[in-house]
Regions:
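Double-stranded beta-helix
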Residues: 8-10, 71-97
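Transition segment at domain starts
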Residues: 1-4
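Structural motif
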Residues: 40, 65, 73-75
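A generic "binding-loop/recognition-motif" signal
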Residues: 29-30, 48, 64, 72
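A cytosolic small-molecule/anion-sensing beta-strand core signal
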Residues: 37-38, 54, 72
Length: 97
């Protein structure tokens, strides 16, 4: 389940996913923060894999290919600086090609 949260100049994408589910590898043009609010995940950044347990906050640098796999049921937030408030447009703006 995805929930979008917006404030002045900020966007938070809340993802709730079950054990075994994954967020596909992707890359952003800008650095951002990700917050693991609940659960345990394996985070892939480039060639590195790190197991993280909530609560945790990690930085994802611009240009780094990354993905997440849930090792337990999880709540994960990606926090981005943007003025865009249309959920149908934020991924197009924030995810690099």
């Amino acid at each position: 389940m995805i929930t979008h949260h917006f404030s002045d100049g900020l966007y938070a994408k809340e993802s709730q996913f079950s054990e075994g589910m994954a967020i596909l590898k992707h890359v952003h043009d800008f650095s951002h923060l990700s917050i693991l609010a609940k659960g345990k995940v394996a985070v892939m950044k480039g060639e590195d894999v790190e197991v993280i347990e909530a609560p945790a906050c990690i930085e994802i640098k611009a240009g780094v290919t990354h993905g997440v796999k849930a090792l337990t049921d999880c709540v994960w937030f990606c926090i981005h600086a943007t003025d865009e408030k249309d959920p149908s447009k934020v991924d197009d703006i924030l995810i690099g090609v």
